[in-house]
């Protein structure tokens, strides 16, 4: 009937066998602790099993249960410690101590108080185990007498346990998502989740209390199976294993909890580090000939350990003798360097180099530091008590601790060098910045001098600018507009557009502004057969070509002095072509001797006579100038046109594109018999009542572009007049 209401688990059976009234079974206790640490059983279930076992009335069973509980506390992991430090277990112990019924056995009571004190001392500073300290102080206040305190480190309760499993939707190694075909698998060593491809290895984990092979991922498998390689100079001395170290150790870790190969490597590394620590005064030189010759003497297997000890002693003695010889040679080298300066002495000194700095680490010291780091790294996977059972690690730690002053001096020297280099770098950057500034100033000054040297360059520019600018200086005292348009006469000029400003001139009485046809002249007016293309094209490339007369033409009113004018300025050279022999306007500075000083209203009349007499009707002139009559000399018509246009440009004072008066040469009068290709251009003249300057502004559109809209009404169209030259023929 009792079996119906109570069931015994496998853990309860093992606990009963481990806590029987017979002698203590330490192996079974460790096996139970491994089960708890590997999480094969739940920690709460294990705690309740031990609590039930403590209720037994047999004092031997209670003492055995307390010992088993202490073993599980020290080796069961933090998850089991949390259950022991819970109120459920600790209050049960307090109730056993304070029971008023049957008195508790004295040995059981002392053992219980001792364990509570030890657990409270080891759990100091851990918030998850603070109830142990509270129970200990509560019992002290109630008057319980505890045994003398033992200094117990908190590492006594530290033991490696399998980590908590982590969940994820993808493999934490190859990032492959899990699906119905790709299942999740947890690594027992790290707790991460992987797929089947990344966790196909199995390995026992004795450091976690897992003795049977379990699933691990590829990374943990490589980390656990690969052993840190020893230095190359240690492999030659692998035969000199001191087995006396194993005999001297009273507490040997059990084979189920540590790998045999790890123990051998650890002892070998410790022995070699001790040998090197004894000979740390030397520069790292260890003779290898004696070591390589000694193993041949070990012949029999019976006295193998004794012979290895003798060989080890002989090797140490040989290394000490070599060290003394090396010291003597080093001292002799120092004396020889101080006394002699010849080449032979220098060669012998070079054979035994002196240490560069006293604070530099020797190769042996560097090797000891790396060895100690490797050993500490490997001890992390071992039970907590392993480091306490290996006194050689402590000796190696002390020998390395003696290097701290040397390392501090080296660090200080390095920091001073670093500060010096930073200072030098700052100075160098400042000097480079100053040098760059000097170079920039020198380049800027050279560029400004170069630009001033080429301010006025004669000749036409191959890249004309569409928008002209007024030059800064005017040669020969001419006004800005006259210098702009006549500083370098253009070979082919179009008739000016009639948007002349009506400002009066300062030295002449201008009664009527110059009127001219608006927009560029149609190509039909100058489309004479047999004309030659000028050598330099116009600045806009669209002006009609006009044949140039020969220099010996009798109709030239002014002398041909193309080189008599000064060179154009830098701005005018973009808008003026090569000088024309017939259009040197700068050579004209006033009325010619023998000519009548007429007002400027005659120039538009002559232009009308030259261009529009083919209509058969005279062009109407302004009523304010009835006294002007056309000249009798037909050859002087272009000159008067130029003269009129030049003073019109002077009256405006501003350059415009359409104000470049292009007077046709005298030869053009004999080829105007062709009919115009377009409608006759209207005459742009102001009405008598209009004031001067009523035009909106100069037309700056390029020659050849469509004529802009004008704000004045053109005169009535006249019939094409016949050229006077044709009448003369």
From Swiss-Prot:
It holds the Pfam family VHS. Gene3D superfamilies: 1.20.5.1940, 1.25.40.90, 6.10.140.100, Zinc/RING finger domain, C3HC4 (zinc finger). A zinc finger (FYVE-type) spans 165-225. Residues 276-310, 325-356, 496-729 are annotated as: Disordered. Keywords: Endosome, Membrane, Metal-binding, Repeat, Zinc, Zinc-finger. Disulfide bonds: none annotated. Residues 16-147 form the VHS domain. GO terms for molecular function: phosphatidylinositol-3-phosphate binding; ubiquitin binding; zinc ion binding. The keyword tRNA-binding does not apply. It is found in: Endosome membrane. The keyword Signal does not apply. GO terms for biological process: protein targeting to vacuole; protein transport to vacuole involved in ubiquitin-dependent protein catabolic process via the multivesicular body sorting pathway. Component of the ESCRT-0 complex composed of HSE1 and VPS27. Belongs to the VPS27 family. Component of the ESCRT-0 complex which is the sorting receptor for ubiquitinated cargo proteins at the multivesicular body (MVB) and recruits ESCRT-I to the MVB outer membrane. This is Vacuolar protein sorting-associated protein 27. It comes from Aspergillus fumigatus (strain ATCC MYA-4609 / CBS 101355 / FGSC A1100 / Af293).
């Amino acid at each position: 009937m009792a079996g119906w209401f109570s069931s015994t688990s496998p853990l309860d059976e093992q606990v009963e066998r481990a806590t029987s009234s017979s002698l203590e079974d330490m192996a079974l206790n460790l096996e139970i602790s491994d089960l708890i640490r590997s999480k094969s059983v739940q920690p709460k279930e294990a705690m309740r099993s031990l609590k039930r076992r403590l209720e037994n009335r047999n004092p031997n069973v209670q003492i055995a249960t307390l010992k088993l509980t202490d073993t599980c506390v020290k080796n069961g992991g933090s998850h089991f410690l949390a259950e022991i430090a819970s109120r459920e277990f600790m209050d049960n112990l307090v109730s056993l101590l304070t029971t008023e019924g049957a008195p508790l056995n004295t040995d059981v009571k002392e053992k219980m108080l001792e364990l509570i004190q030890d657990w409270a001392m080891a759990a100091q500073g851990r918030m998850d185990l603070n109830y142990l300290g509270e129970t200990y102080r509560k019992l002290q206040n109630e008057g319980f007498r505890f045994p003398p305190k033992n200094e117990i480190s908190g590492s006594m309760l530290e033991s490696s346990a399998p980590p908590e499993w982590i969940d994820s939707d993808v493999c934490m190694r190859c990032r492959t998502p899990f699906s119905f075909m790709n299942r999740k698998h947890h690594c027992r060593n790290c707790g991460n989740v992987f797929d089947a491809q990344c966790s196909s290895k199995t390995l026992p984990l004795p450091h976690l209390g897992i003795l049977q092979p379990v699933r691990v991922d590829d990374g943990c498998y490589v980390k656990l199976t690969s052993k840190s390689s020893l230095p190359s100079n240690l492999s030659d001395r692998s035969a000199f294993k001191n087995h006396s170290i194993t005999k001297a150790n009273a507490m040997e870790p059990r084979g189920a909890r540590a790998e045999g190969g790890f123990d051998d490597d650890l002892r070998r590394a410790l022995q070699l580090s001790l040998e090197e620590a004894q000979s740390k005064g030397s520069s790292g030189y260890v003779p290898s000939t004696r070591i390589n010759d000694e193993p041949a003497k070990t012949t029999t297997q019976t006295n193998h350990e004794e012979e290895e000890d003798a060989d080890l002693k002989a090797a140490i003695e040989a290394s000490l003798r070599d060290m003394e010889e090396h010291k003597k040679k080093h001292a002799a080298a120092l004396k020889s360097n101080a006394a002699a300066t010849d080449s032979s002495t220098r060669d012998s000194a070079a054979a035994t180099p002196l240490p560069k700095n006293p604070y530099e680490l020797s190769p042996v010291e560097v090797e000891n530091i790396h060895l100690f780091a490797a050993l500490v790294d490997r001890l992390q996977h071992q039970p907590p008590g392993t480091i306490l059972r290996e006194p050689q690690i402590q000796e190696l730690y002390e020998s390395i601790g003696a290097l701290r002053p040397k390392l501090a001096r080296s660090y200080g020297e390095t920091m001073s060098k670093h500060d010096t280099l930073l200072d030098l770098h700052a100075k160098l950057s400042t000097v480079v910045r100053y040098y760059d500034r000097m170079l920039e100033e020198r380049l800027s000054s050279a560029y400004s001098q170069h630009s001033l040297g080429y301010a006025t360059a004669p000749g036409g520019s191959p890249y004309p600018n569409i928008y002209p600018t007024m030059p800064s200086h005017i040669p020969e005292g001419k006004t800005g507009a006259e210098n702009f348009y006549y500083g370098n006469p253009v070979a082919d000029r179009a008739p000016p557009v009639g948007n002349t400003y009506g400002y009066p001139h300062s030295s002449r009485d201008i009664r009527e502004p110059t009127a001219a046809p608006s927009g560029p002249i149609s190509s039909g007016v100058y489309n004479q057969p047999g004309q030659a293309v000028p050598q330099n094209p116009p600045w806009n490339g669209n002006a009609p070509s006009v044949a140039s007369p020969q220099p010996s033409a009798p109709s030239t009113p002014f002398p041909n002095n193309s080189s008599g004018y000064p060179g154009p300025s830098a701005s005018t050279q973009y808008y003026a072509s090569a000088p024309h022999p017939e259009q040197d306007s700068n050579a004209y500075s006033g009325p010619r001797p023998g000519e009548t000083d007429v007002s400027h209203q005659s120039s538009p009349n002559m232009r009308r006579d030259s261009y529009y007499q083919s209509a058969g009707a005279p062009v109407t002139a302004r009523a304010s100038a009835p006294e002007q009559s056309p000249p009798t000399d037909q050859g002087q018509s272009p000159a008067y046109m130029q003269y009129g246009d030049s003073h019109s440009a002077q009256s405006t004072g501003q350059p415009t594109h359409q104000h470049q008066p292009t007077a046709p040469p005298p030869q053009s009068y004999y080829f105007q018999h062709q009919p115009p290709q377009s409608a006759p251009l209207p005459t742009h003249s102001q009405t008598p009542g209009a004031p001067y300057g009523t035009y909106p502004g100069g037309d700056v559109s390029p020659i050849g572009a469509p004529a802009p809209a004008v704000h004045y009404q053109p005169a009535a169209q006249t019939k094409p007049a016949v050229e006077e030259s044709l009448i003369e023929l």
